[in-house]
Amino acid sequence: MRIGIAGMQTTELAAKSIQETLSDAGFDSFYFRNNSKTTMADLVIVLGGDRGVRNYFHRALDVDTPVLGISESESNGVLAQIELKELPSYLNRIKKQDYVIEDVPRIGVKVDGKNTYPVLNDVSVFTSKSATLMEYILRVNDEEVWHDSSDGVIISTPTGSSAYSLSAGGPIIFQASNVFGIISVNSLDITRRPIIVSDNSIIEIDEISSRLHCDVVLDGIDRFKINNKLEATKFTPSARIIRMKADSTAVSALANKVKLAEELLSMPPSSKLLLKILEYEGSMTQKELASKTLLPGRTVRLAMKHLMDKGYIKRNVSMQDARQKIYEIAKLD
């Protein structure tokens, strides 16, 4: 079996370490940056946790090769189930191909008529400044569903339903469900509820307007200015993800949310924000967190200490740079 090694910001040193582990177990492996080389592999190991896997599939030219997502350390990953330190214990199963390959749905996105890359979690529309209302019309298969005024709107896959969508009041959707969720964020209409549609639907967010310009946000990573219309449809082919563990990502995500709920109510706003960013984005450095949230460095440090004291996050040494510390969500027992 030939294994490719890729990952967001993966260093050649880290890749070499994994290659040595694979070589000792009898695997032929190679490290690559150009996704066109995935055709040379029977399986691709992607580092960087869920965020690394999402980033990989945003750029992948060939998605037929199944992907095994790996986190650098402890993580409640949905796309990346296993930790780097666990990899040696799974190599025998990998050699025997004793795993399940799951077809994970993706959403194809058009912004004002132009295609973007497909998303694994969600696509959303918000104004360029938070807490600013936008108006839009939601259409499903050319039928108008609602005319809304809200902070934004999210279209989610089953995978993304346990991420930002859930925090905005959306439902948890089990992985095998052939549906997408649509969630209005803080609508002025208090009766507005999330809806579930077939993943074969054509979803349109149309006639978008606000006193500020609006942005499309893809998987919580990239933002693009939008003038009038977003179209979302099922994208083929799906992403092929290797599952080494049989636990239900939907059930485990819900259990974690319930366990956190009580203490979240009394948590400082800065801690809530940082926890949410780590939950959605995956492992990040303190500098990355400050840049992402625009919080002062001192506020970030105090909030991270609070979260570590509570056991919500862990601090680890980056495998890419031993001088650098990374933070990520800790597993809940």
Please state what every model-predicted region is.
Residues 125, 130, 141-145, 195-272, ...:
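ATP/nucleoside-binding phosphotransfer catalytic cores, i.e., glycine-rich phosphate-binding loops
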Residues 278-281:
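Short helix-capping/hinge SLiMs at alpha-helix to coil transitions
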Residues 1-47, 52-62, 81-102, 110-117, ...:
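ATP/NTP phosphate-donor binding region
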Residues 308-318:
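A short, conserved structural fragment
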Residues 147-151, 155-191:
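Gly/Ser/Thr-rich active-site loops/lids in small-molecule metabolic enzymes
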Residues 284-292:
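Short acidic, hydrophobic short linear motifs in intrinsically disordered regions
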Residues 264-271, 285, 316-333:
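Short, cationic-aromatic polyanion-contact patches
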